Design a protein with these regions (language model features):
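Hydrophobic face of amphipathic alpha-helices that form TPR/SEL1-like repeat modules
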Residues: 1-37
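Conserved C-terminal structural/oligomerization subdomain of aldehyde/semialdehyde dehydrogenase
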Residues: 38-44, 204, 228, 265, ...
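Residue-level signal for inorganic ion chemistry
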Residues: 39, 75, 97, 119, ...
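Short, solvent-exposed loop/turn elements at beta->coil junctions and helix N-caps
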Residues: 81, 140-142, 360-366
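Glycine-rich loop-to-alpha-helix module at the N-terminal edge of alpha/beta enzyme cores
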Residues: 40-129, 140
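ALDH superfamily catalytic-core signature
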Residues: 238-382, 411, 445, 492-496, ...
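Rossmann-like NAD(P) dinucleotide-binding subdomain of oxidoreductase/dehydrogenase enzymes
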Residues: 131-274, 327, 402, 467
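Structural signal for hydrophobic packing residues in well-ordered secondary-structure cores
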Residues: 64, 68, 83-86, 90, ...
Length: 505
Protein backbone atom coordinates (compact mmCIF):
# COMPACT_ATOMS: atom_id res chain seq x y z
CA UNK A 1 0.00 0.00 0.00
CA UNK A 2 1.49 3.33 -1.09
CA UNK A 3 2.02 6.29 1.19
CA UNK A 4 -0.26 9.28 0.74
CA UNK A 5 2.65 11.55 -0.16
CA UNK A 6 3.37 9.46 -3.24
CA UNK A 7 -0.11 10.11 -4.62
CA UNK A 8 0.79 13.68 -5.47
CA UNK A 9 3.19 14.28 -8.33
CA UNK A 10 4.03 11.91 -11.15
CA UNK A 11 0.79 9.97 -11.28
CA UNK A 12 -2.86 10.92 -11.20
CA UNK A 13 -4.68 10.68 -7.85
CA UNK A 14 -8.19 9.18 -7.85
CA UNK A 15 -10.26 10.34 -4.89
CA UNK A 16 -13.81 10.52 -3.59
CA UNK A 17 -16.81 12.49 -4.82
CA UNK A 18 -19.13 13.68 -2.07
CA UNK A 19 -21.92 16.24 -2.17
CA UNK A 20 -21.22 17.33 -5.73
CA UNK A 21 -17.43 17.68 -5.70
CA UNK A 22 -14.10 15.90 -5.34
CA UNK A 23 -13.17 15.90 -1.65
CA UNK A 24 -9.94 15.40 0.24
CA UNK A 25 -9.76 12.08 2.07
CA UNK A 26 -8.62 11.67 5.65
CA UNK A 27 -6.82 8.46 4.67
CA UNK A 28 -3.07 7.90 4.57
CA UNK A 29 -3.48 4.72 2.49
CA UNK A 30 -3.35 4.68 -1.31
CA UNK A 31 -3.39 1.81 -3.79
CA UNK A 32 -1.58 1.70 -7.11
CA UNK A 33 -3.52 1.51 -10.38
CA UNK A 34 -1.64 -0.02 -13.31
CA UNK A 35 -1.79 0.18 -17.07
CA UNK A 36 -2.32 -3.54 -17.55
CA UNK A 37 -0.77 -3.55 -21.04
CA UNK A 38 2.55 -2.09 -19.87
CA UNK A 39 2.70 -2.85 -16.16
CA UNK A 40 3.37 0.82 -15.45
CA UNK A 41 1.65 2.68 -12.64
CA UNK A 42 -0.83 5.15 -14.11
CA UNK A 43 -2.71 6.37 -11.02
CA UNK A 44 -3.12 6.04 -7.29
CA UNK A 45 -6.47 5.58 -5.62
CA UNK A 46 -7.34 6.55 -2.07
CA UNK A 47 -8.35 3.82 0.38
CA UNK A 48 -11.22 5.55 2.15
CA UNK A 49 -11.56 5.59 5.92
CA UNK A 50 -14.76 4.94 7.84
CA UNK A 51 -15.01 8.71 8.25
CA UNK A 52 -14.83 9.24 4.48
CA UNK A 53 -17.67 6.79 3.93
CA UNK A 54 -19.67 8.32 6.77
CA UNK A 55 -19.42 11.72 5.06
CA UNK A 56 -20.75 10.25 1.80
CA UNK A 57 -23.64 8.54 3.58
CA UNK A 58 -24.48 11.76 5.42
CA UNK A 59 -24.51 13.69 2.12
CA UNK A 60 -26.76 11.08 0.51
CA UNK A 61 -29.10 11.10 3.50
CA UNK A 62 -29.33 14.90 3.48
CA UNK A 63 -30.09 14.98 -0.26
CA UNK A 64 -32.78 12.29 -0.06
CA UNK A 65 -35.87 14.29 1.01
CA UNK A 66 -35.64 16.82 -1.81
CA UNK A 67 -34.63 14.30 -4.48
CA UNK A 68 -37.30 11.75 -3.56
CA UNK A 69 -39.92 14.50 -3.90
CA UNK A 70 -38.56 15.74 -7.23
CA UNK A 71 -41.20 15.18 -9.94
CA UNK A 72 -40.55 11.95 -11.80
CA UNK A 73 -40.45 13.74 -15.16
CA UNK A 74 -37.62 15.92 -13.89
CA UNK A 75 -35.72 12.85 -12.73
CA UNK A 76 -36.24 11.29 -16.16
CA UNK A 77 -34.84 14.39 -17.85
CA UNK A 78 -31.61 14.00 -15.88
CA UNK A 79 -31.33 10.50 -17.37
CA UNK A 80 -31.98 11.80 -20.88
CA UNK A 81 -29.23 14.39 -20.42
CA UNK A 82 -26.86 11.79 -18.95
CA UNK A 83 -27.36 9.60 -22.01
CA UNK A 84 -26.47 12.54 -24.26
CA UNK A 85 -23.32 13.33 -22.26
CA UNK A 86 -22.10 9.73 -22.19
CA UNK A 87 -22.48 9.55 -25.96
CA UNK A 88 -20.52 12.80 -26.27
CA UNK A 89 -17.62 11.48 -24.15
CA UNK A 90 -17.83 7.86 -25.25
CA UNK A 91 -14.35 7.67 -26.79
CA UNK A 92 -12.73 9.19 -23.70
CA UNK A 93 -14.52 6.74 -21.39
CA UNK A 94 -13.47 3.79 -23.55
CA UNK A 95 -9.84 4.86 -23.29
CA UNK A 96 -10.12 5.08 -19.49
CA UNK A 97 -11.47 1.53 -19.41
CA UNK A 98 -8.80 0.17 -21.74
CA UNK A 99 -5.90 1.81 -19.92
CA UNK A 100 -6.85 0.49 -16.49
CA UNK A 101 -8.63 -2.77 -17.30
CA UNK A 102 -6.85 -3.79 -20.50
CA UNK A 103 -9.75 -4.86 -22.71
CA UNK A 104 -9.52 -3.73 -26.33
CA UNK A 105 -11.16 -0.44 -27.28
CA UNK A 106 -14.02 -1.95 -29.27
CA UNK A 107 -14.83 -4.19 -26.31
CA UNK A 108 -14.74 -1.17 -23.99
CA UNK A 109 -17.09 0.66 -26.33
CA UNK A 110 -19.45 -2.34 -26.28
CA UNK A 111 -19.43 -2.21 -22.47
CA UNK A 112 -20.46 1.45 -22.61
CA UNK A 113 -23.25 0.61 -25.05
CA UNK A 114 -24.77 -2.04 -22.79
CA UNK A 115 -24.64 0.36 -19.86
CA UNK A 116 -26.21 3.11 -21.94
CA UNK A 117 -29.14 0.83 -22.65
CA UNK A 118 -29.92 0.76 -18.91
CA UNK A 119 -29.79 4.57 -18.87
CA UNK A 120 -32.25 4.55 -21.78
CA UNK A 121 -34.50 2.18 -19.84
CA UNK A 122 -34.33 4.50 -16.82
CA UNK A 123 -35.49 7.38 -19.04
CA UNK A 124 -38.89 5.66 -19.02
CA UNK A 125 -39.19 5.80 -15.24
CA UNK A 126 -42.53 7.73 -15.23
CA UNK A 127 -44.15 4.68 -16.77
CA UNK A 128 -42.06 2.08 -14.94
CA UNK A 129 -43.11 3.14 -11.43
CA UNK A 130 -46.81 3.58 -12.13
CA UNK A 131 -49.00 1.98 -9.49
CA UNK A 132 -52.39 0.31 -9.76
CA UNK A 133 -55.84 1.72 -8.97
CA UNK A 134 -59.22 0.20 -8.19
CA UNK A 135 -62.22 2.38 -7.51
CA UNK A 136 -65.20 1.35 -5.43
CA UNK A 137 -63.53 -1.67 -3.82
CA UNK A 138 -66.09 -1.07 -1.09
CA UNK A 139 -68.90 1.42 -0.73
CA UNK A 140 -67.22 4.79 -1.27
CA UNK A 141 -63.81 3.13 -0.93
CA UNK A 142 -60.93 3.29 -3.43
CA UNK A 143 -57.62 1.40 -3.35
CA UNK A 144 -54.38 2.22 -5.10
CA UNK A 145 -50.69 1.36 -4.91
CA UNK A 146 -47.56 3.43 -5.41
CA UNK A 147 -43.85 2.69 -5.66
CA UNK A 148 -41.67 4.89 -3.48
CA UNK A 149 -37.87 5.04 -3.12
CA UNK A 150 -36.03 2.82 -0.66
CA UNK A 151 -33.76 5.65 0.51
CA UNK A 152 -29.97 5.72 0.47
CA UNK A 153 -28.68 2.92 -1.77
CA UNK A 154 -25.16 1.66 -2.37
CA UNK A 155 -23.46 -0.20 -5.20
CA UNK A 156 -20.25 -2.23 -4.85
CA UNK A 157 -18.87 -3.05 -8.27
CA UNK A 158 -16.11 -5.29 -9.74
CA UNK A 159 -13.07 -4.57 -11.88
CA UNK A 160 -14.19 -6.40 -15.02
CA UNK A 161 -16.82 -3.86 -16.12
CA UNK A 162 -15.90 -0.49 -14.57
CA UNK A 163 -18.43 1.35 -16.76
CA UNK A 164 -21.26 -1.10 -17.37
CA UNK A 165 -21.87 -2.64 -13.94
CA UNK A 166 -22.24 0.72 -12.15
CA UNK A 167 -24.72 1.63 -14.91
CA UNK A 168 -26.67 -1.52 -14.08
CA UNK A 169 -27.31 0.12 -10.71
CA UNK A 170 -27.23 3.89 -10.32
CA UNK A 171 -29.44 5.05 -13.25
CA UNK A 172 -32.45 3.08 -12.02
CA UNK A 173 -31.73 3.77 -8.36
CA UNK A 174 -31.54 7.53 -8.94
CA UNK A 175 -34.46 7.62 -11.39
CA UNK A 176 -36.61 5.86 -8.78
CA UNK A 177 -35.92 8.72 -6.36
CA UNK A 178 -33.13 7.21 -4.25
CA UNK A 179 -29.73 8.69 -3.49
CA UNK A 180 -26.70 6.55 -4.25
CA UNK A 181 -23.17 5.73 -3.09
CA UNK A 182 -20.85 3.92 -5.51
CA UNK A 183 -17.86 1.91 -4.25
CA UNK A 184 -16.01 0.87 -7.43
CA UNK A 185 -13.13 -1.56 -7.74
CA UNK A 186 -9.83 -0.11 -6.61
CA UNK A 187 -8.15 -1.78 -9.61
CA UNK A 188 -9.77 0.48 -12.25
CA UNK A 189 -11.53 3.33 -10.43
CA UNK A 190 -11.40 6.25 -12.86
CA UNK A 191 -14.76 5.67 -14.56
CA UNK A 192 -16.52 6.24 -11.25
CA UNK A 193 -15.45 9.88 -11.10
CA UNK A 194 -16.40 10.32 -14.75
CA UNK A 195 -19.95 9.23 -13.91
CA UNK A 196 -20.04 11.72 -11.04
CA UNK A 197 -18.91 14.56 -13.29
CA UNK A 198 -21.42 13.72 -16.02
CA UNK A 199 -24.31 13.38 -13.58
CA UNK A 200 -23.48 16.79 -12.13
CA UNK A 201 -23.36 18.25 -15.64
CA UNK A 202 -26.71 16.59 -16.36
CA UNK A 203 -28.27 18.56 -13.51
CA UNK A 204 -28.26 16.04 -10.68
CA UNK A 205 -28.28 17.89 -7.33
CA UNK A 206 -25.27 17.55 -5.00
CA UNK A 207 -25.41 14.58 -2.67
CA UNK A 208 -27.66 12.43 -4.83
CA UNK A 209 -24.69 10.52 -6.30
CA UNK A 210 -21.49 9.99 -4.32
CA UNK A 211 -18.33 7.93 -4.87
CA UNK A 212 -16.11 6.37 -2.21
CA UNK A 213 -12.95 4.59 -3.31
CA UNK A 214 -11.29 1.89 -1.30
CA UNK A 215 -11.18 -1.68 -0.09
CA UNK A 216 -12.80 -3.79 2.62
CA UNK A 217 -12.87 -0.85 5.05
CA UNK A 218 -15.23 1.07 2.76
CA UNK A 219 -17.27 -2.03 1.97
CA UNK A 220 -17.82 -3.06 5.58
CA UNK A 221 -18.74 0.49 6.58
CA UNK A 222 -21.43 0.47 3.90
CA UNK A 223 -22.74 -2.95 4.93
CA UNK A 224 -23.05 -2.03 8.60
CA UNK A 225 -24.47 1.49 8.39
CA UNK A 226 -28.17 1.61 9.26
CA UNK A 227 -28.76 4.70 7.11
CA UNK A 228 -28.31 2.65 3.94
CA UNK A 229 -31.48 0.86 2.87
CA UNK A 230 -30.31 -1.27 -0.07
CA UNK A 231 -27.03 -2.70 -1.37
CA UNK A 232 -26.27 -3.99 -4.86
CA UNK A 233 -23.13 -6.07 -5.40
CA UNK A 234 -21.42 -7.83 -8.29
CA UNK A 235 -18.30 -9.92 -7.72
CA UNK A 236 -17.09 -13.32 -6.52
CA UNK A 237 -19.29 -15.76 -4.63
CA UNK A 238 -17.37 -15.66 -1.31
CA UNK A 239 -17.66 -11.87 -1.20
CA UNK A 240 -21.27 -11.99 -2.41
CA UNK A 241 -22.11 -14.27 0.51
CA UNK A 242 -20.41 -11.88 2.93
CA UNK A 243 -22.23 -8.89 1.46
CA UNK A 244 -25.58 -10.65 1.57
CA UNK A 245 -25.27 -12.03 5.09
CA UNK A 246 -23.83 -8.86 6.62
CA UNK A 247 -26.08 -6.34 4.89
CA UNK A 248 -29.28 -8.34 5.35
CA UNK A 249 -28.44 -8.88 9.03
CA UNK A 250 -28.35 -5.10 9.27
CA UNK A 251 -31.84 -4.76 7.81
CA UNK A 252 -30.91 -3.92 4.22
CA UNK A 253 -32.41 -5.08 0.98
CA UNK A 254 -29.63 -6.93 -0.90
CA UNK A 255 -28.96 -8.20 -4.40
CA UNK A 256 -25.52 -9.86 -4.50
CA UNK A 257 -24.42 -11.37 -7.79
CA UNK A 258 -21.64 -13.93 -7.40
CA UNK A 259 -19.46 -16.25 -9.44
CA UNK A 260 -20.11 -18.35 -12.50
CA UNK A 261 -19.02 -21.34 -14.53
CA UNK A 262 -20.89 -20.82 -17.78
CA UNK A 263 -21.28 -23.85 -20.05
CA UNK A 264 -21.81 -23.97 -23.80
CA UNK A 265 -23.32 -27.23 -25.08
CA UNK A 266 -22.44 -28.26 -28.63
CA UNK A 267 -24.86 -30.78 -30.13
CA UNK A 268 -23.81 -33.04 -33.04
CA UNK A 269 -26.15 -31.18 -35.40
CA UNK A 270 -24.73 -27.73 -34.56
CA UNK A 271 -23.12 -25.46 -37.13
CA UNK A 272 -19.53 -26.09 -36.03
CA UNK A 273 -18.16 -22.92 -37.63
CA UNK A 274 -20.62 -20.79 -35.70
CA UNK A 275 -20.08 -22.74 -32.49
CA UNK A 276 -16.30 -22.29 -32.80
CA UNK A 277 -16.66 -18.56 -33.47
CA UNK A 278 -18.93 -18.29 -30.45
CA UNK A 279 -16.43 -20.08 -28.21
CA UNK A 280 -13.52 -17.88 -29.26
CA UNK A 281 -15.47 -14.68 -28.66
CA UNK A 282 -17.25 -15.79 -25.49
CA UNK A 283 -14.29 -17.64 -23.99
CA UNK A 284 -11.42 -15.29 -24.79
CA UNK A 285 -13.06 -11.89 -25.22
CA UNK A 286 -11.98 -9.48 -22.49
CA UNK A 287 -9.36 -12.14 -21.58
CA UNK A 288 -12.14 -14.23 -20.05
CA UNK A 289 -12.73 -11.63 -17.32
CA UNK A 290 -16.50 -11.64 -17.69
CA UNK A 291 -19.10 -13.04 -15.33
CA UNK A 292 -20.88 -14.37 -18.43
CA UNK A 293 -17.78 -15.67 -20.23
CA UNK A 294 -18.04 -19.22 -21.50
CA UNK A 295 -15.46 -21.25 -19.60
CA UNK A 296 -16.79 -24.82 -19.98
CA UNK A 297 -17.61 -26.56 -23.26
CA UNK A 298 -19.83 -29.64 -23.16
CA UNK A 299 -19.64 -31.67 -26.35
CA UNK A 300 -22.43 -34.20 -26.92
CA UNK A 301 -21.94 -37.49 -28.75
CA UNK A 302 -19.45 -37.24 -31.59
CA UNK A 303 -19.37 -33.43 -31.74
CA UNK A 304 -15.96 -32.94 -30.07
CA UNK A 305 -13.64 -33.72 -32.99
CA UNK A 306 -15.56 -31.72 -35.63
CA UNK A 307 -15.68 -28.82 -33.18
CA UNK A 308 -11.93 -28.97 -32.47
CA UNK A 309 -11.21 -29.06 -36.20
CA UNK A 310 -12.91 -25.67 -36.52
CA UNK A 311 -11.91 -24.24 -33.14
CA UNK A 312 -8.14 -24.73 -33.10
CA UNK A 313 -7.34 -22.61 -36.19
CA UNK A 314 -9.51 -19.81 -34.81
CA UNK A 315 -7.66 -19.88 -31.48
CA UNK A 316 -4.33 -19.85 -33.30
CA UNK A 317 -5.44 -16.81 -35.35
CA UNK A 318 -6.63 -14.84 -32.30
CA UNK A 319 -4.86 -11.48 -32.12
CA UNK A 320 -3.60 -10.79 -28.60
CA UNK A 321 -2.02 -7.47 -27.66
CA UNK A 322 -2.50 -4.02 -26.20
CA UNK A 323 -6.09 -2.88 -25.97
CA UNK A 324 -5.31 0.53 -27.47
CA UNK A 325 -4.68 -1.22 -30.82
CA UNK A 326 -8.21 -1.81 -32.06
CA UNK A 327 -7.05 -4.51 -34.45
CA UNK A 328 -6.39 -6.77 -31.46
CA UNK A 329 -9.10 -9.10 -30.19
CA UNK A 330 -7.85 -9.87 -26.67
CA UNK A 331 -5.88 -7.75 -24.24
CA UNK A 332 -4.07 -8.41 -20.95
CA UNK A 333 -5.46 -9.45 -17.59
CA UNK A 334 -6.13 -6.84 -14.94
CA UNK A 335 -3.08 -7.30 -12.65
CA UNK A 336 0.08 -9.34 -12.33
CA UNK A 337 -1.46 -11.16 -9.36
CA UNK A 338 -4.52 -12.17 -11.33
CA UNK A 339 -2.42 -13.27 -14.32
CA UNK A 340 -0.36 -15.47 -12.01
CA UNK A 341 -3.53 -16.93 -10.47
CA UNK A 342 -4.88 -17.86 -13.91
CA UNK A 343 -1.50 -19.33 -14.85
CA UNK A 344 -1.60 -21.46 -11.69
CA UNK A 345 -4.94 -22.91 -12.84
CA UNK A 346 -3.30 -23.99 -16.10
CA UNK A 347 -0.60 -25.71 -14.03
CA UNK A 348 -3.33 -27.33 -11.95
CA UNK A 349 -5.27 -28.58 -14.97
CA UNK A 350 -2.17 -30.39 -16.22
CA UNK A 351 -1.59 -31.92 -12.79
CA UNK A 352 -5.21 -33.09 -12.62
CA UNK A 353 -4.89 -34.93 -15.92
CA UNK A 354 -6.85 -32.76 -18.34
CA UNK A 355 -5.37 -32.71 -21.85
CA UNK A 356 -3.74 -29.33 -22.51
CA UNK A 357 -4.49 -28.69 -26.19
CA UNK A 358 -3.52 -25.00 -26.31
CA UNK A 359 -1.11 -23.59 -23.71
CA UNK A 360 -1.50 -19.85 -23.17
CA UNK A 361 1.60 -19.79 -20.97
CA UNK A 362 3.73 -20.34 -24.09
CA UNK A 363 2.10 -17.63 -26.21
CA UNK A 364 4.52 -15.12 -27.73
CA UNK A 365 2.62 -12.25 -26.09
CA UNK A 366 3.77 -13.39 -22.63
CA UNK A 367 7.23 -12.01 -23.45
CA UNK A 368 5.77 -8.50 -23.70
CA UNK A 369 5.43 -6.04 -20.82
CA UNK A 370 2.08 -6.11 -19.10
CA UNK A 371 -0.10 -8.86 -17.72
CA UNK A 372 -0.62 -11.10 -20.72
CA UNK A 373 -1.55 -14.75 -21.15
CA UNK A 374 -2.50 -16.43 -24.38
CA UNK A 375 -5.73 -18.38 -24.94
CA UNK A 376 -5.76 -21.82 -23.32
CA UNK A 377 -7.83 -24.92 -24.08
CA UNK A 378 -8.20 -28.11 -22.03
CA UNK A 379 -9.91 -31.25 -23.37
CA UNK A 380 -11.02 -34.46 -21.65
CA UNK A 381 -11.68 -32.74 -18.34
CA UNK A 382 -13.97 -34.32 -15.75
CA UNK A 383 -16.44 -33.00 -13.22
CA UNK A 384 -14.16 -33.73 -10.27
CA UNK A 385 -11.34 -31.49 -11.53
CA UNK A 386 -10.92 -28.08 -9.92
CA UNK A 387 -10.05 -26.60 -13.30
CA UNK A 388 -13.64 -27.43 -14.25
CA UNK A 389 -15.34 -26.76 -10.94
CA UNK A 390 -13.90 -23.35 -10.08
CA UNK A 391 -14.26 -19.93 -11.66
CA UNK A 392 -10.88 -19.16 -13.25
CA UNK A 393 -11.83 -15.74 -14.67
CA UNK A 394 -9.25 -15.85 -17.43
CA UNK A 395 -8.77 -17.01 -21.05
CA UNK A 396 -9.13 -20.72 -20.26
CA UNK A 397 -11.69 -23.01 -21.91
CA UNK A 398 -12.28 -26.47 -20.43
CA UNK A 399 -13.96 -29.16 -22.52
CA UNK A 400 -15.99 -32.04 -21.11
CA UNK A 401 -17.22 -34.82 -23.41
CA UNK A 402 -20.56 -36.50 -22.66
CA UNK A 403 -22.53 -39.18 -24.47
CA UNK A 404 -26.05 -37.78 -24.52
CA UNK A 405 -28.11 -34.62 -24.36
CA UNK A 406 -29.47 -35.72 -20.96
CA UNK A 407 -25.89 -36.07 -19.71
CA UNK A 408 -25.18 -32.48 -20.76
CA UNK A 409 -28.16 -31.19 -18.78
CA UNK A 410 -27.16 -33.29 -15.77
CA UNK A 411 -23.56 -32.01 -15.79
CA UNK A 412 -24.67 -28.38 -15.87
CA UNK A 413 -27.39 -28.83 -13.27
CA UNK A 414 -24.95 -30.52 -10.89
CA UNK A 415 -22.61 -27.51 -10.91
CA UNK A 416 -22.84 -25.16 -7.93
CA UNK A 417 -23.10 -22.08 -10.15
CA UNK A 418 -26.08 -21.21 -12.31
CA UNK A 419 -25.36 -17.88 -13.96
CA UNK A 420 -25.47 -18.37 -17.73
CA UNK A 421 -25.43 -21.19 -20.27
CA UNK A 422 -25.93 -21.76 -23.97
CA UNK A 423 -26.72 -24.51 -26.45
CA UNK A 424 -25.75 -24.63 -30.11
CA UNK A 425 -28.08 -26.84 -32.13
CA UNK A 426 -30.40 -26.92 -35.14
CA UNK A 427 -32.94 -29.01 -33.20
CA UNK A 428 -35.81 -26.90 -31.91
CA UNK A 429 -37.09 -29.63 -29.60
CA UNK A 430 -33.67 -29.98 -27.95
CA UNK A 431 -33.35 -26.22 -27.59
CA UNK A 432 -36.79 -25.93 -26.01
CA UNK A 433 -36.16 -28.80 -23.60
CA UNK A 434 -32.78 -27.33 -22.68
CA UNK A 435 -34.28 -23.92 -21.93
CA UNK A 436 -37.04 -25.44 -19.80
CA UNK A 437 -35.01 -27.93 -17.77
CA UNK A 438 -31.62 -26.31 -17.26
CA UNK A 439 -31.14 -24.90 -13.73
CA UNK A 440 -29.51 -21.66 -14.80
CA UNK A 441 -30.76 -18.08 -14.69
CA UNK A 442 -29.84 -16.92 -18.21
CA UNK A 443 -30.01 -19.23 -21.22
CA UNK A 444 -28.87 -18.77 -24.80
CA UNK A 445 -29.99 -20.74 -27.84
CA UNK A 446 -27.32 -20.31 -30.51
CA UNK A 447 -26.34 -17.19 -28.55
CA UNK A 448 -23.08 -17.66 -26.60
CA UNK A 449 -23.40 -14.84 -24.04
CA UNK A 450 -27.11 -14.46 -23.23
CA UNK A 451 -26.89 -11.22 -21.25
CA UNK A 452 -30.46 -9.87 -21.15
CA UNK A 453 -31.19 -6.49 -22.65
CA UNK A 454 -31.96 -3.61 -20.31
CA UNK A 455 -35.73 -4.13 -20.31
CA UNK A 456 -35.31 -7.69 -19.01
CA UNK A 457 -33.27 -8.52 -15.90
CA UNK A 458 -29.85 -10.06 -15.21
CA UNK A 459 -29.47 -12.72 -12.56
CA UNK A 460 -28.31 -16.27 -12.01
CA UNK A 461 -29.48 -19.19 -9.92
CA UNK A 462 -27.93 -21.27 -7.15
CA UNK A 463 -24.64 -19.83 -5.83
CA UNK A 464 -24.52 -17.17 -8.53
CA UNK A 465 -27.13 -14.93 -6.87
CA UNK A 466 -27.86 -14.09 -3.24
CA UNK A 467 -31.09 -12.22 -2.69
CA UNK A 468 -34.52 -12.42 -4.25
CA UNK A 469 -34.22 -9.89 -7.08
CA UNK A 470 -32.11 -9.76 -10.22
CA UNK A 471 -30.45 -6.59 -11.44
CA UNK A 472 -31.82 -3.90 -13.83
CA UNK A 473 -35.01 -4.30 -15.89
CA UNK A 474 -38.27 -4.48 -13.96
CA UNK A 475 -36.55 -6.49 -11.22
CA UNK A 476 -34.28 -3.47 -10.75
CA UNK A 477 -37.26 -1.12 -10.48
CA UNK A 478 -38.78 -3.38 -7.83
CA UNK A 479 -35.48 -3.60 -5.96
CA UNK A 480 -35.04 0.17 -5.77
CA UNK A 481 -38.65 0.91 -4.74
CA UNK A 482 -41.00 -0.07 -1.94
CA UNK A 483 -44.62 -0.85 -2.60
CA UNK A 484 -47.21 1.11 -0.66
CA UNK A 485 -50.94 0.40 -0.88
CA UNK A 486 -53.50 3.06 0.10
CA UNK A 487 -57.15 2.42 0.89
CA UNK A 488 -59.16 5.66 1.03
CA UNK A 489 -62.71 6.69 1.85
CA UNK A 490 -63.95 10.26 1.71
CA UNK A 491 -66.57 11.82 4.01
CA UNK A 492 -69.50 10.91 1.78
CA UNK A 493 -68.69 7.28 2.43
CA UNK A 494 -68.86 7.46 6.26
CA UNK A 495 -72.18 9.26 6.81
CA UNK A 496 -73.70 6.13 8.32
CA UNK A 497 -71.66 6.54 11.51
CA UNK A 498 -69.03 4.41 13.18
CA UNK A 499 -67.94 1.24 11.39
CA UNK A 500 -66.43 -1.57 13.47
CA UNK A 501 -65.43 -3.89 10.61
CA UNK A 502 -63.06 -3.72 7.64
CA UNK A 503 -64.66 -1.77 4.78
CA UNK A 504 -65.97 -4.07 2.07
CA UNK A 505 -69.02 -4.45 -0.13
Amino acid sequence: MAEKAEAVGAVRAVGNWVNGEVVESTSDRYGDVFDSATGERCAQVVMSTEGDVDAAIAAAKAALPAWSRTPVLRRARVMFKLKELIERDRAEIAQLITQEHGKVLHDADGEIQRGLEVVEFACGIPHLIKGEFNDQVGTGVDSYSMRQPVGVCAGITPFNFPAMVPMWMFPLAIACGNTFILKPSEKDPSCSLKWAELLAEAGLPPGVFNVVQGDHVAVNTILNDERIGAVSFVGSTPVAEHVYSTASANGKRVQALGGAKNHLVVMPDADMDKAADALVGAGYGSAGERCMAISAVVTVGDSAEPLLEKLLPKIEALKVGTGMDNSNEMGPLITAEHRDKVRSYIDLGEEEGAKLVVDGRQHEITKSPGYFLGPTLFDHASQDMRVYQEEIFGPVLTMIRVDTFDDAIRVINEHEYGNGTSIFTRDGDAAREFANHIEVGMVGVNVPIPVPLAFHSFGGWKRSLFGDMSIYGMEGVRFYTRLKTVTSRWPTGIRSGADFSMPTM
